[in-house]
């Protein structure tokens, strides 16, 4: 590694954060500067860094600056022209990165000759989040002259000028499913050359895009494609940043686990119906209905709940019937069904078989929503090893950052969950929050709360009294969090007529 270039890159960090950004309204934060130096070293030395960055550090500016300086000072080599990937958990952060952070830094860096041209970024996401122009044309024709909700009609027609489904409000779930890009595009589609989704893919593959932004699920899906030697979803990249990294295990649980809901079963039967296999769809629907009946709680729940899966005699019989029919259908319909529908039949069979056999590689449970509707869920016990194989063995530098990576002053738990325990390239960095908690926070424990039965009206009244006093003390600047919907509703009813400040209840 060229020592002079490395020193120049670190010198630019000092100039950027001590001079250029303050000239544009940002304060100098020593923790942010130290964090950016550590992140740049991680990228230059091909390491993996766990960066615990407290509230108010400005970690997004830190890692974006480190990535841009990597591109500036080390543009050559096999990875020189490759982009970086920034993976987040929330759409809000993705929007902020592409709409605020990158344009702001790009302008300042251009004005001060740090970069020769603007930094270009693009959000990458699944095809089901985009409009299929052919399917949209069919749907618009189908609703012509029909009595349709006006807001939904406007949302549907707005897709003629906006192909990003996430950017349109008021669109019904049914319309969304009818117009989204299908799992497999027909090669004979007459709109293929003018398709907006394919134009998006073409632009995304351009060498001009330096920052690819995606969510954790998309990142893991790309990694799965690479492991299976399928075409990657993302362009080959030279560095990886995982923001909101504490959410990565949740995404991995979804990716490496399996789940089946009533909606999944309904969709599978609908696919068979569309292929004109009406009787097969009816028989399968009956088997699925019996299985759901064996799982249902049959009651409204205060909040979503999960319970361990127990293979009762009724559930065993229902699962056996479903599996038997799925196997028969795969055998009989193999010459006639599209391959992707056959694949759906196969993956449904495999998922149900986990519960029928009690597969010990998975934690099996039932997830109930608030209506009591069940979903069968299987969480992999091998998730850390799967993450390690997917992300950490590819010899690409990576930065994992969040405000909650440490627990009890240690990264031990995070290393375990992320599959990083045996990684030799791993480094830790802690950037303490500049927020003075000792001076600005008070832990208040009321000493006069009487003992009340849990869930009682008396409990709600006592809590309401304390909350009203605290709201008065803070002049309305209060957020009250509950672990129970029913208790929240009861307290809300107690306080709503007593406050002079605006009150909002969020479910």
Task: Tell me the role of every PLM-derived stretch.
Residues 45-65:
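Walker A/P-loop
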Residues 26-43:
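N-terminal pre-P-loop "Q-motif" helix
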Residues 63-65, 69, 92-95, 99-103, ...:
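Signature of the SF2 helicase/ATPase Hel1-core->accessory helical subdomain module
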Residues 82-92, 399-403, 476-483:
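Conserved RecA-like ASCE P-loop NTPase motor core of nucleic-acid helicases/translocases
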Residues 2-22, 27-30, 74-212, 216-217, ...:
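A substrate-engagement module of RecA-like helicase motors
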Residues 185-210, 223-231, 328-447, 458-459, ...:
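A contiguous, basic/glycine-rich beta-loop/short-helix subdomain that forms a polymer-engagement track
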Residues 479-507:
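Conserved helicase motor "Helicase C" RecA-like lobe of SF1/SF2 P-loop NTPases
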Residues 389, 448-483:
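Conserved interdomain hinge at the start of the Helicase C-terminal
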């Amino acid at each position: 590694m060229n020592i002079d270039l490395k020193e120049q890159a670190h010198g630019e960090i000092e100039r950027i954060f001590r001079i250029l950004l303050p000239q544009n309204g940002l304060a100098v934060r020593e923790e942010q500067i130290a964090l950016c130096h550590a992140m740049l070293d991680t990228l230059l030395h091909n390491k993996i860094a766990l960066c615990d960055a407290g509230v108010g550090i400005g970690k997004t500016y830190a890692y974006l600056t480190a990535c841009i300086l990597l591109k500036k000072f080390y543009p050559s080599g096999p990875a020189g022209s490759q982009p970086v990937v920034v993976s987040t958990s929330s759409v809000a952060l993705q929007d902020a990165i592409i709409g605020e952070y990158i344009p702001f830094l790009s302008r300042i860096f251009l004005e001060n000759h740090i970069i020769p041209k603007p930094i270009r970024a693009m959000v990458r996401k699944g095809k089901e989040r985009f409009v299929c122009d052919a399917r949209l044309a069919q749907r618009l024709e189908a609703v012509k002259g029909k009595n349709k909700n006006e807001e939904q009609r406007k949302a549907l027609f707005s897709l003629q000028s906006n192909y990003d489904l996430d950017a349109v409000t008021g669109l019904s779930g049914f319309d969304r499913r009818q117009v989204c890009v299908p799992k497999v595009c027909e090669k004979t589609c007459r709109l293929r050359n003018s398709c907006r989704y394919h134009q998006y893919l073409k632009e995304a593959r351009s060498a001009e895009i330096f920052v690819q932004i995606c969510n954790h699920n998309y990142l893991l899906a790309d990694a799965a494609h690479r492991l299976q030697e399928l075409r990657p979803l993302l362009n080959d990249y030279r560095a990886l940043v995982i923001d909101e990294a504490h959410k990565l295990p949740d995404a991995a649980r979804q990716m490496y686990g399996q789940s089946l809901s009533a909606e999944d079963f309904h969709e599978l039967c609908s696919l068979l119906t569309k292929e004109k296999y009406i009787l097969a769809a009816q028989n399968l629907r009956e088997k699925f209905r019996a299985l759901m009946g064996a799982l249902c709680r049959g009651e409204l729940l205060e909040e979503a709940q999960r319970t361990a899966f127990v293979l009762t005699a009724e559930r065993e019989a229902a699962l056996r019937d479903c599996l038997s029919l799925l196997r028969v259908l795969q055998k009989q319909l193999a010459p006639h069904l599209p391959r992707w529908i056959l694949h759906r039949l196969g993956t449904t069979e495999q998922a149900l078989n986990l519960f029928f056999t009690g597969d010990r590689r998975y934690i099996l449970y039932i997830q109930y929503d608030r209506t009591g509707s069940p979903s069968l869920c299987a969480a992999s016990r091998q998730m850390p090893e799967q993450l390690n194989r997917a992300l950490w063995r590819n010899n690409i530098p990576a930065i994992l950052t969040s405000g909650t990576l440490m627990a009890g002053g240690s990264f031990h738990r995070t290393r375990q969950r992320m599959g990083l325990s045996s990684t030799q390239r791993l480094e830790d960095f802690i950037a303490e929050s500049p927020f003075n908690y000792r001076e600005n926070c008070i832990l208040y424990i009321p000493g006069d709360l009487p003992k009340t039965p849990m869930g009682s009206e008396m409990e709600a009244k006592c809590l309401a009294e304390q909350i009203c006093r605290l709201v008065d003390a803070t002049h309305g600047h209060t957020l009250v969090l509950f672990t129970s919907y029913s208790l929240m509703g009861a307290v809300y009813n107690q306080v709503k007529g007593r406050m002079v400040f605006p009150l909002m209840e969020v479910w």
